[in-house]
Amino acid sequence: MKKLLILLTFVSFVFSKTFYYDVYVFFFRVGEIKIQIDKEKSYAEGKTLESMKWLYSYDFRFYEEKGDMKLYEREKEKVRVFGKDKIYEKKPWIPLLVDYLKTGKVKENNLFKVKKEGNKFIVIPLKSKRVKKIILKDGKVPKEIVIHGKVKIKLKLRKAEDDKGTV
């Protein structure tokens, strides 16, 4: 049974795309994020760089499958688990980015107000108190994502690849 589960996990991610982003606060690189997407499910993980953990320690794991979502996060020594509704309140940029990388579209709905300006989307999360604005820049695979909250955070694309190599 254990071997079957490992095989199914491997097969489900064989036809996938993986995106690597570096995380910046001001002009300091503070972390990294990896997002893996296939047709049925998505996975994202992020963490503070080892060299920055003395200042701030945070990591997360996000899982999405057929509309169901879970976010596991560890901040300093606190561990929290969020379901779909809480994710859209606390970290709306994660499911937004995953969906955008999956479909190439940002959908305006009861969760997001969307405005397109040239080659960027400006997204206002309607359920979040912390995140005020998310900007996706430069195309179907955003080269830069800017998250406006208490602190402005930038994600810069380092690498994108699929099963055949670099996208």
From Swiss-Prot:
One of its GO terms (cellular component) is membrane. It is found in: Membrane. It is a single-pass membrane protein. Keywords: Membrane, Transmembrane, Transmembrane helix. The chain crosses the membrane at residues 5-27. This is Uncharacterized protein aq_1581. The lineage of its organism: Bacteria, Pseudomonadati, Aquificota, Aquificia, Aquificales.
